[in-house]
Amino acid sequence: MKISAALILSSLSSVAFSAPAPAPADSHHEDHHKDEKPAVVTVTQYIDSNAATSTVESAATTTTLSSSEKDTSEQKRDGGFQDGTVKCSDFPSVNGIVSLDWLGFGGWASVMDMDANTSSECKDGYYCSYACEPGMSKTQWPSDQPSDGKSVGGLYCKNGYLYRTNTDTSDLCSTDETSAKAINKKSDSIALCRTDYPGSENMVIPTVVDGGDSQPISVVDEDTYYQWQGKKTSAQYYINNAGVSAEDGCIWGTSGSDVGNWAPLVLGAGSTNGETYLSLIPNPNSNQAANFNVKIVASDGANVQGSCAYEDGSFTGDGSDGCTVSVLSGSAEFVFY
Protein backbone atom coordinates (compact mmCIF):
# COMPACT_ATOMS: atom_id res chain seq x y z
CA MET A 1 0.00 0.00 0.00
CA LYS A 2 1.22 3.49 -0.85
CA ILE A 3 -0.17 6.33 1.19
CA SER A 4 0.66 9.94 1.88
CA ALA A 5 2.35 10.57 5.18
CA ALA A 6 3.12 13.49 7.44
CA LEU A 7 6.71 14.59 7.95
CA ILE A 8 7.38 16.92 10.82
CA LEU A 9 10.95 18.18 11.12
CA SER A 10 10.41 20.55 14.02
CA SER A 11 7.92 20.54 16.90
CA LEU A 12 4.53 21.40 15.44
CA SER A 13 0.87 20.61 15.45
CA SER A 14 0.05 20.82 11.78
CA VAL A 15 0.45 17.96 9.33
CA ALA A 16 2.54 18.20 6.19
CA PHE A 17 2.38 15.55 3.52
CA SER A 18 2.56 14.78 -0.12
CA ALA A 19 1.89 12.05 -2.62
CA PRO A 20 3.87 8.97 -3.50
CA ALA A 21 6.96 9.73 -5.53
CA PRO A 22 8.74 7.42 -7.94
CA ALA A 23 12.15 6.89 -6.38
CA PRO A 24 13.34 6.52 -2.76
CA ALA A 25 16.07 8.46 -1.05
CA ASP A 26 16.86 9.12 2.63
CA SER A 27 14.46 8.67 5.53
CA HIS A 28 13.40 11.15 8.19
CA HIS A 29 11.89 11.06 11.66
CA GLU A 30 8.20 11.86 12.07
CA ASP A 31 6.92 13.60 15.18
CA HIS A 32 3.75 15.38 16.30
CA HIS A 33 3.31 17.91 19.10
CA LYS A 34 -0.31 18.94 19.23
CA ASP A 35 -0.02 21.76 21.72
CA GLU A 36 2.75 23.82 20.13
CA LYS A 37 2.71 26.30 17.27
CA PRO A 38 6.14 26.37 15.63
CA ALA A 39 7.22 26.65 12.04
CA VAL A 40 6.66 23.63 9.81
CA VAL A 41 8.48 22.09 6.89
CA THR A 42 7.29 19.55 4.36
CA VAL A 43 8.81 17.19 1.85
CA THR A 44 7.49 14.62 -0.57
CA GLN A 45 7.25 11.41 1.42
CA TYR A 46 5.70 8.02 0.90
CA ILE A 47 5.65 4.48 2.18
CA ASP A 48 7.00 2.02 -0.35
CA SER A 49 5.98 -1.60 -0.83
CA ASN A 50 8.46 -2.66 1.85
CA ALA A 51 6.91 -0.25 4.37
CA ALA A 52 10.03 1.92 4.31
CA THR A 53 9.42 5.62 4.71
CA SER A 54 11.32 7.51 2.03
CA THR A 55 11.78 10.97 0.63
CA VAL A 56 12.79 12.18 -2.78
CA GLU A 57 15.68 14.59 -3.21
CA SER A 58 15.99 17.07 -6.02
CA ALA A 59 17.96 20.21 -6.80
CA ALA A 60 16.49 23.42 -5.43
CA THR A 61 15.83 26.34 -7.72
CA THR A 62 17.84 29.52 -7.31
CA THR A 63 16.21 32.89 -6.75
CA THR A 64 17.68 36.28 -5.99
CA LEU A 65 16.39 39.45 -4.43
CA SER A 66 15.82 42.24 -6.90
CA SER A 67 17.86 45.44 -6.61
CA SER A 68 15.46 47.58 -8.65
CA GLU A 69 15.15 51.19 -7.59
CA LYS A 70 11.82 52.34 -6.23
CA ASP A 71 9.75 54.92 -8.09
CA THR A 72 6.44 56.66 -7.60
CA SER A 73 4.33 54.61 -10.00
CA GLU A 74 1.13 52.96 -8.78
CA GLN A 75 0.52 49.26 -8.34
CA LYS A 76 0.14 47.41 -11.60
CA ARG A 77 -3.16 45.56 -12.09
CA ASP A 78 -2.32 43.50 -15.17
CA GLY A 79 -0.75 40.58 -13.28
CA GLY A 80 2.81 41.92 -13.32
CA PHE A 81 4.57 43.33 -10.27
CA GLN A 82 7.20 46.06 -10.32
CA ASP A 83 9.82 46.11 -7.59
CA GLY A 84 10.04 49.17 -5.40
CA THR A 85 6.72 50.69 -6.47
CA VAL A 86 4.36 49.40 -3.78
CA LYS A 87 4.74 50.52 -0.19
CA CYS A 88 5.04 47.82 2.44
CA SER A 89 2.06 49.40 4.15
CA ASP A 90 -0.08 48.75 1.05
CA PHE A 91 -1.35 45.33 0.03
CA PRO A 92 -0.61 44.70 -3.68
CA SER A 93 -3.47 44.68 -6.17
CA VAL A 94 -2.43 42.34 -8.97
CA ASN A 95 -4.16 39.48 -10.74
CA GLY A 96 -4.54 36.34 -8.64
CA ILE A 97 -3.58 37.71 -5.25
CA VAL A 98 -6.14 37.50 -2.41
CA SER A 99 -6.28 39.64 0.72
CA LEU A 100 -6.87 37.74 3.98
CA ASP A 101 -8.37 40.56 5.98
CA TRP A 102 -9.64 38.42 8.87
CA LEU A 103 -6.12 37.49 9.97
CA GLY A 104 -5.23 41.03 11.03
CA PHE A 105 -1.98 41.26 9.04
CA GLY A 106 -3.07 43.87 6.55
CA GLY A 107 -4.18 41.24 4.04
CA TRP A 108 -0.99 39.16 4.24
CA ALA A 109 -0.99 35.44 5.04
CA SER A 110 1.98 35.89 7.37
CA VAL A 111 4.89 38.24 8.03
CA MET A 112 8.19 36.65 9.10
CA ASP A 113 11.92 37.28 9.02
CA MET A 114 14.77 34.82 8.63
CA ASP A 115 14.94 34.29 12.40
CA ALA A 116 11.26 33.25 12.56
CA ASN A 117 10.26 36.51 14.21
CA THR A 118 6.73 37.49 13.23
CA SER A 119 4.93 40.78 12.83
CA SER A 120 1.34 41.92 12.42
CA GLU A 121 2.42 44.32 9.67
CA CYS A 122 4.68 44.13 6.65
CA LYS A 123 7.84 46.05 7.59
CA ASP A 124 11.51 46.38 6.70
CA GLY A 125 13.53 43.18 6.87
CA TYR A 126 10.47 40.92 6.78
CA TYR A 127 9.03 38.57 4.18
CA CYS A 128 5.37 39.25 3.54
CA SER A 129 3.62 36.09 2.39
CA TYR A 130 0.35 36.20 0.48
CA ALA A 131 -2.52 34.04 -0.74
CA CYS A 132 -3.54 33.34 -4.32
CA GLU A 133 -6.90 32.44 -5.83
CA PRO A 134 -8.00 28.77 -5.86
CA GLY A 135 -5.99 26.83 -8.41
CA MET A 136 -3.02 29.20 -8.18
CA SER A 137 0.17 29.30 -6.08
CA LYS A 138 2.48 32.10 -5.07
CA THR A 139 5.72 32.41 -7.01
CA GLN A 140 7.78 34.34 -4.51
CA TRP A 141 10.25 32.99 -1.97
CA PRO A 142 13.99 33.58 -1.46
CA SER A 143 16.51 30.94 -2.45
CA ASP A 144 18.32 31.57 0.84
CA GLN A 145 16.16 29.92 3.50
CA PRO A 146 16.63 29.68 7.29
CA SER A 147 19.30 27.17 8.23
CA ASP A 148 17.17 25.61 10.97
CA GLY A 149 14.68 24.11 8.50
CA LYS A 150 11.96 26.72 8.80
CA SER A 151 10.75 28.44 5.64
CA VAL A 152 9.95 31.98 4.54
CA GLY A 153 8.11 33.17 1.48
CA GLY A 154 6.51 36.16 -0.15
CA LEU A 155 7.66 39.66 -1.05
CA TYR A 156 10.52 41.34 0.80
CA CYS A 157 10.09 44.70 2.50
CA LYS A 158 13.13 46.97 2.07
CA ASN A 159 13.32 50.70 2.77
CA GLY A 160 9.54 50.84 2.99
CA TYR A 161 8.85 49.22 -0.40
CA LEU A 162 8.12 45.70 -1.62
CA TYR A 163 10.50 43.65 -3.77
CA ARG A 164 10.22 40.28 -5.41
CA THR A 165 12.27 37.43 -3.99
CA ASN A 166 12.09 35.54 -7.28
CA THR A 167 12.92 37.87 -10.16
CA ASP A 168 12.35 35.15 -12.76
CA THR A 169 8.69 36.17 -12.92
CA SER A 170 6.71 39.38 -12.44
CA ASP A 171 3.51 37.43 -11.74
CA LEU A 172 2.92 36.94 -8.03
CA CYS A 173 0.59 33.97 -8.64
CA SER A 174 0.90 31.17 -11.19
CA THR A 175 -1.72 28.70 -12.38
CA ASP A 176 -1.21 25.16 -11.10
CA GLU A 177 -1.85 21.86 -12.87
CA THR A 178 -5.54 21.45 -13.76
CA SER A 179 -5.78 17.80 -12.77
CA ALA A 180 -8.06 18.10 -9.72
CA LYS A 181 -11.08 20.00 -8.48
CA ALA A 182 -13.51 19.89 -5.57
CA ILE A 183 -17.25 19.42 -6.13
CA ASN A 184 -19.69 20.10 -3.30
CA LYS A 185 -23.00 18.23 -3.46
CA LYS A 186 -24.00 19.31 0.03
CA SER A 187 -26.08 22.41 0.71
CA ASP A 188 -23.59 24.04 3.09
CA SER A 189 -20.30 25.47 1.87
CA ILE A 190 -17.03 23.72 2.67
CA ALA A 191 -13.84 25.66 3.43
CA LEU A 192 -10.61 23.98 2.38
CA CYS A 193 -7.71 25.84 3.97
CA ARG A 194 -4.32 25.55 2.30
CA THR A 195 -1.15 26.01 4.30
CA ASP A 196 0.94 29.13 3.82
CA TYR A 197 4.07 27.44 2.50
CA PRO A 198 6.82 28.42 2.23
CA GLY A 199 5.98 30.67 5.12
CA SER A 200 4.21 30.26 8.45
CA GLU A 201 2.61 26.91 7.46
CA ASN A 202 -0.62 28.12 9.02
CA MET A 203 -3.70 26.87 7.20
CA VAL A 204 -5.08 30.26 6.18
CA ILE A 205 -5.40 30.25 2.36
CA PRO A 206 -9.05 29.60 1.50
CA THR A 207 -10.75 27.60 -1.20
CA VAL A 208 -14.47 27.84 -0.39
CA VAL A 209 -16.73 25.46 -2.31
CA ASP A 210 -20.35 26.55 -2.06
CA GLY A 211 -23.15 24.01 -2.15
CA GLY A 212 -23.70 22.81 -5.71
CA ASP A 213 -20.51 24.48 -6.90
CA SER A 214 -16.94 23.45 -7.73
CA GLN A 215 -13.48 24.97 -7.30
CA PRO A 216 -10.02 23.98 -8.56
CA ILE A 217 -7.57 22.25 -6.25
CA SER A 218 -3.99 23.51 -6.46
CA VAL A 219 -1.95 20.64 -7.86
CA VAL A 220 1.57 22.02 -7.73
CA ASP A 221 4.25 20.83 -10.12
CA GLU A 222 6.64 19.41 -7.55
CA ASP A 223 9.48 19.37 -10.07
CA THR A 224 9.47 23.19 -10.30
CA TYR A 225 7.71 24.28 -7.09
CA TYR A 226 9.35 25.20 -3.78
CA GLN A 227 11.82 22.60 -2.56
CA TRP A 228 12.81 22.17 1.05
CA GLN A 229 16.52 21.40 1.33
CA GLY A 230 16.43 19.87 -2.15
CA LYS A 231 13.30 17.81 -1.51
CA LYS A 232 10.02 18.20 -3.36
CA THR A 233 6.94 19.56 -1.64
CA SER A 234 3.23 19.56 -2.44
CA ALA A 235 0.07 21.49 -1.57
CA GLN A 236 -1.83 20.62 1.57
CA TYR A 237 -5.31 21.62 2.71
CA TYR A 238 -7.12 21.25 6.02
CA ILE A 239 -10.79 20.47 5.34
CA ASN A 240 -13.24 22.03 7.78
CA ASN A 241 -16.68 20.66 8.48
CA ALA A 242 -19.43 21.76 6.11
CA GLY A 243 -20.93 25.06 7.21
CA VAL A 244 -17.70 26.52 8.63
CA SER A 245 -16.76 29.79 6.91
CA ALA A 246 -13.30 30.70 5.66
CA GLU A 247 -13.06 33.39 8.34
CA ASP A 248 -13.83 30.86 11.08
CA GLY A 249 -12.00 27.87 9.61
CA CYS A 250 -8.94 29.17 7.77
CA ILE A 251 -7.11 30.11 10.96
CA TRP A 252 -4.84 28.52 13.53
CA GLY A 253 -7.45 26.84 15.71
CA THR A 254 -7.50 25.79 19.34
CA SER A 255 -7.88 22.37 20.90
CA GLY A 256 -11.45 21.14 20.61
CA SER A 257 -12.45 23.81 18.10
CA ASP A 258 -12.54 21.35 15.15
CA VAL A 259 -11.37 24.14 12.82
CA GLY A 260 -8.08 25.05 11.17
CA ASN A 261 -5.30 22.75 12.36
CA TRP A 262 -7.98 20.82 14.28
CA ALA A 263 -10.18 20.21 11.24
CA PRO A 264 -11.03 16.53 10.66
CA LEU A 265 -9.30 15.81 7.33
CA VAL A 266 -6.19 16.81 5.38
CA LEU A 267 -5.95 16.79 1.59
CA GLY A 268 -2.72 16.60 -0.39
CA ALA A 269 -2.11 17.35 -4.06
CA GLY A 270 1.00 17.33 -6.21
CA SER A 271 2.34 16.33 -9.58
CA THR A 272 5.74 14.90 -10.43
CA ASN A 273 7.13 13.28 -13.56
CA GLY A 274 3.83 13.86 -15.31
CA GLU A 275 1.65 12.06 -12.75
CA THR A 276 -0.71 13.69 -10.25
CA TYR A 277 -1.11 12.27 -6.75
CA LEU A 278 -4.16 13.10 -4.64
CA SER A 279 -4.54 12.06 -1.02
CA LEU A 280 -6.85 12.16 1.97
CA ILE A 281 -5.70 11.44 5.51
CA PRO A 282 -7.22 11.96 8.96
CA ASN A 283 -5.83 14.90 10.88
CA PRO A 284 -3.97 13.39 13.86
CA ASN A 285 -4.83 16.51 15.86
CA SER A 286 -8.53 15.63 15.62
CA ASN A 287 -10.48 12.56 16.70
CA GLN A 288 -13.82 13.89 15.47
CA ALA A 289 -15.52 12.53 12.36
CA ALA A 290 -16.32 15.03 9.63
CA ASN A 291 -19.95 15.96 8.95
CA PHE A 292 -19.55 15.07 5.28
CA ASN A 293 -18.46 12.21 3.06
CA VAL A 294 -15.89 12.66 0.31
CA LYS A 295 -14.57 10.47 -2.47
CA ILE A 296 -12.00 10.89 -5.24
CA VAL A 297 -13.43 9.94 -8.62
CA ALA A 298 -12.13 10.11 -12.17
CA SER A 299 -13.45 12.79 -14.49
CA ASP A 300 -14.87 11.61 -17.80
CA GLY A 301 -12.16 10.02 -19.92
CA ALA A 302 -9.50 10.20 -17.20
CA ASN A 303 -7.13 7.41 -16.21
CA VAL A 304 -7.05 7.28 -12.40
CA GLN A 305 -5.43 4.45 -10.46
CA GLY A 306 -6.46 3.54 -6.93
CA SER A 307 -9.59 4.24 -4.92
CA CYS A 308 -10.12 6.68 -2.09
CA ALA A 309 -13.22 7.57 -0.08
CA TYR A 310 -14.14 8.78 3.39
CA GLU A 311 -17.64 7.75 4.44
CA ASP A 312 -19.32 7.95 7.84
CA GLY A 313 -16.02 8.72 9.55
CA SER A 314 -13.98 5.91 8.00
CA PHE A 315 -11.78 5.43 4.96
CA THR A 316 -12.92 2.86 2.43
CA GLY A 317 -10.11 3.09 -0.12
CA ASP A 318 -6.59 1.73 0.01
CA GLY A 319 -6.20 1.94 3.77
CA SER A 320 -7.87 2.75 7.08
CA ASP A 321 -5.41 5.56 7.81
CA GLY A 322 -5.91 7.42 4.55
CA CYS A 323 -5.68 6.80 0.84
CA THR A 324 -4.04 8.04 -2.34
CA VAL A 325 -4.88 7.89 -6.03
CA SER A 326 -2.68 8.66 -9.01
CA VAL A 327 -3.97 10.49 -12.07
CA LEU A 328 -2.14 9.25 -15.16
CA SER A 329 -4.18 11.31 -17.61
CA GLY A 330 -7.11 13.68 -17.43
CA SER A 331 -8.29 14.87 -14.03
CA ALA A 332 -9.98 13.72 -10.83
CA GLU A 333 -12.63 15.18 -8.54
CA PHE A 334 -12.95 15.38 -4.77
CA VAL A 335 -16.71 14.94 -4.47
CA PHE A 336 -18.24 16.04 -1.15
CA TYR A 337 -21.67 14.63 -0.31
Curated annotation (Swiss-Prot):
GO terms for cellular component: cell surface; fungal-type cell wall; fungal-type vacuole; mitochondrion. GO terms for biological process: fungal-type cell wall organization; proton motive force-driven mitochondrial ATP synthesis. Residues 68-80 have a biased composition (Basic and acidic residues). It holds the Pfam family SUN. Residues 57-67 have a biased composition (Low complexity). Keywords: Mitochondrion, Transit peptide. It comes from the Eukaryota. Residues 57-84 are annotated as: Disordered. It is found in: Mitochondrion. Involved in the mitochondrial expression of subunits 6 and 8 of the F0-F1 ATP synthase. PANTHER family: BETA-GLUCOSIDASE-LIKE PROTEIN NCA3, MITOCHONDRIAL-RELATED. Belongs to the SUN family. This is Beta-glucosidase-like protein NCA3, mitochondrial. The gene is NCA3.
